Amino acid sequence: MAKRSMIEREKKRIKLHQKYESKRQALLEEYNSTSDFNLKLEIHSKIQRLPRNSSKIRIRNRCWKTGRPRGYYRDFGVSRHVLREMAHQCLLPGVTKSSW
């Protein structure tokens, strides 16, 4: 189980990303469409003034049940440990144990 503070920090990052997503996207589109160097520097400084945690890159995928950041399966939203437990309990439709 992940520390409670890490899970809360991740939730805070998600909220910040949702809050500043449209503003950041508009600035990036303006930055990419402009060819004037001085204007690009000005836009870049505006982007840098946004909160660091409002960037999507800073968000880490975590298991919804345990908060584990590693061994995360995107399709299910859980870590490998929880995936195995849920598959054995037949809680994931269509998932079967492989044998060959």
From Swiss-Prot:
Q: Specify the superkingdom.
A: Eukaryota
Where is this protein localized, as stated in its record? Plastid, Chloroplast
Query: What InterPro entries is this protein classified in?
Result: Ribosomal_uS14, Ribosomal_uS14_bac/plastid, Ribosomal_uS14_CS
> Which is a GO BP term held by this UniProt record?
translation
Per UniProt, which keywords does this protein have? Chloroplast, Plastid, Ribonucleoprotein, Ribosomal protein, RNA-binding, rRNA-binding
Gene Ontology cellular component annotations, sorted alphabetically: chloroplast; small ribosomal subunit
What GO annotations for molecular function exist for this entry?
A: rRNA binding; structural constituent of ribosome
Q: How does it assemble?
A: Part of the 30S ribosomal subunit.
UniProt family annotation: Belongs to the universal ribosomal protein uS14 family.
Briefly, what is this protein's role?
Answer: Binds 16S rRNA, required for the assembly of 30S particles.
Which protein are we looking at? Answer: Small ribosomal subunit protein uS14c
The source organism is: Thalassiosira pseudonana
